[in-house]
């Protein structure tokens, strides 16, 4: 009887441990119910114009129109063929998935951001990008990202970009 009680306690302890551990990992990893991709995540606008609707269907009112091809957007929710997105300023709504691309772009957040030849603040500067420039996103280390725009390519501090998560690594 004593052995059965000890085994029962161990079983309960193991159950609680697994239940707690499972809850932690589920809270840390949020995925979209449609694509099973991480939420939030960044994408870009595939077209020159994209209607932003109040809800996830064609019957919902168009609140405004995004008018910048390749503009980075953050997906915060999914519903069927619709994605709730927001831009750098937090403006957003629901956009049909066909208007979005997985090609990653970023927005330059600081005026005249120096673009370096290597991920090093002492590396030669190959260009300077103005505030609001949209650039293609390449590799990212813990604090630098490689970007390209207007025929120029180089590295900028990740903190000068919108459209990439602070802890995101890319290669």
Regions found by a protein language model. Give the residues of each.
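Bacterial N-terminal signal peptides that target proteins for export
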Residues: 1-12
